Curated annotation (Swiss-Prot):
Signal peptide (from-to): none
Organism: Human immunodeficiency virus type 1 group M subtype A (isolate MAL)
Location of region: Transactivation: 1-48
Stretches for region Disordered: 1-21, 45-87
Name of this chain's protein: Protein Tat
Modified residues (N6-acetyllysine): 28, 50-51
Chain ranges for the short sequence motif Nuclear localization signal, RNA-binding (TAR), and protein transduction as given in the UniProt record: 49-57
Processing after translation: Asymmetrical arginine methylation by host PRMT6 seems to diminish the transactivation capacity of Tat and affects the interaction with host CCNT1. Acetylation by EP300, CREBBP, GCN5L2/GCN5 and PCAF regulates the transactivation activity of Tat. EP300-mediated acetylation of Lys-50 promotes dissociation of Tat from the TAR RNA through the competitive binding to PCAF's bromodomain. In addition, the non-acetylated Tat's N-terminus can also interact with PCAF. PCAF-mediated acetylation of Lys-28 enhances Tat's binding to CCNT1. Lys-50 is deacetylated by SIRT1.
GO molecular function: actinin binding; cyclin binding; metal ion binding; protein domain specific binding; protein serine/threonine phosphatase inhibitor activity; regulatory region RNA binding; RNA-binding transcription regulator activity; trans-activation response element binding
Coiled-coil regions listed in the entry: none
Keyword field: Acetylation, Activator, AIDS, Apoptosis, Host cytoplasm, Host nucleus, Host-virus interaction, Inhibition of host innate immune response by virus, Inhibition of host interferon signaling pathway by virus, Interferon antiviral system evasion, Isopeptide bond, Metal-binding, Methylation, Modulation of host chromatin by virus, Modulation of host PP1 activity by virus, Phosphoprotein, RNA-binding, Secreted, Transcription, Transcription regulation, Ubl conjugation, Viral immunoevasion, Zinc
Gene transcribed to yield this protein: tat
UniProt KW Transmembrane keyword: no
């Protein structure tokens, strides 16, 4: 291993910075480009602001979705399992 100049900061040591700039590609090679690419692309960790997802609202003029449901009988027997007492 080559000796490193002790006067250099650790982020300026030779080999500490990649030769090419980071890009937005998510291929395997670019995910391992540098530590920052690995954390953001490979692991998917991002400490930026979260974007608020807007809810989809129905149009204001459309009242078709506000129609009341028709009354239905409360007791309906279905299948072979009656809910009443056995005779």
């Amino acid at each position: 291993m080559d000796p490193v100049d002790p006067n250099l900061e650790p982020w300026n040591h030779p080999g500490s910075q990649p030769r090419t700039p980071c890009n937005k590609c998510y291929c395997k090679k670019c995910c391992y480009h540098c530590q920052m690419c690995f954390i953001t692309k490979g692991l998917g960790i991002s400490y930026g602001r979260k974007k608020r997802r807007q809810r989809r609202r129905p149009p204001q003029g459309n009242q078709a979705h506000q129609d009341p449901l028709p009354e239905q009988p409360s007791s309906q027997h279905r299948g072979d399992h009656p809910t009443g007492p056995k005779e």
